[in-house]
Swiss-Prot record:
<feature type="compositionally biased region" description="Low complexity">
    <location>
        <begin position="68"/>
        <end position="82"/>
    </location>
</feature>
<dbReference type="InterPro" id="IPR027534">
    <property type="entry name" value="Ribosomal_P1/P2"/>
</dbReference>
<comment type="subunit">
    <text>P1 and P2 exist as dimers at the large ribosomal subunit.</text>
</comment>
<dbReference type="GO" id="GO:0006414">
    <property type="term" value="P:translational elongation"/>
</dbReference>
<comment type="function">
    <text>Plays an important role in the elongation step of protein synthesis.</text>
</comment>
<keyword id="KW-0963">Cytoplasm</keyword>
<dbReference type="GO" id="GO:0002181">
    <property type="term" value="P:cytoplasmic translation"/>
</dbReference>
<feature type="compositionally biased region" description="Acidic residues">
    <location>
        <begin position="90"/>
        <end position="101"/>
    </location>
</feature>
<dbReference type="GO" id="GO:0043021">
    <property type="term" value="F:ribonucleoprotein complex binding"/>
</dbReference>
<dbReference type="InterPro" id="IPR038716">
    <property type="entry name" value="P1/P2_N_sf"/>
</dbReference>
<dbReference type="GO" id="GO:0003735">
    <property type="term" value="F:structural constituent of ribosome"/>
</dbReference>
<comment type="similarity">
    <text>Belongs to the eukaryotic ribosomal protein P1/P2 family.</text>
</comment>
<protein>
    <recommendedName>
        <fullName>Large ribosomal subunit protein P1</fullName>
    </recommendedName>
</protein>
<keyword id="KW-0689">Ribosomal protein</keyword>
<keyword id="KW-0687">Ribonucleoprotein</keyword>
<dbReference type="GO" id="GO:0022625">
    <property type="term" value="C:cytosolic large ribosomal subunit"/>
</dbReference>
<dbReference type="GO" id="GO:0030295">
    <property type="term" value="F:protein kinase activator activity"/>
</dbReference>
Amino acid sequence: MSTAELAVSYAALILADDGIEVSADKIQTILGAAKVQEVEPIWATIFAKALEGKDIKEILTNVGSAGPATAGAPAAAGAAAPAEEKKEEKEEEKEESDEDMGFGLFD
């Protein structure tokens, strides 16, 4: 993440923390007050449009809650076990076929 993106992100978080609607003008105002000069105005517009109508505090509090994804993990592990058993059976069959051809070292 570039310095410009980081500065605009922090400005948006400051606005959300104060309960102020996030807009490009308000982001630019905060960046000006912080004396951040290297940010192009397009970044403020992009972030303002991306966050328009969204509750930033709710997004931040729900970042770590991935309940359904963790519930599906044991099912995937159970499905992998039969596949491993099939591979072992095939390997055993190949070993037996080598013995039938008389290529054993100690026959």
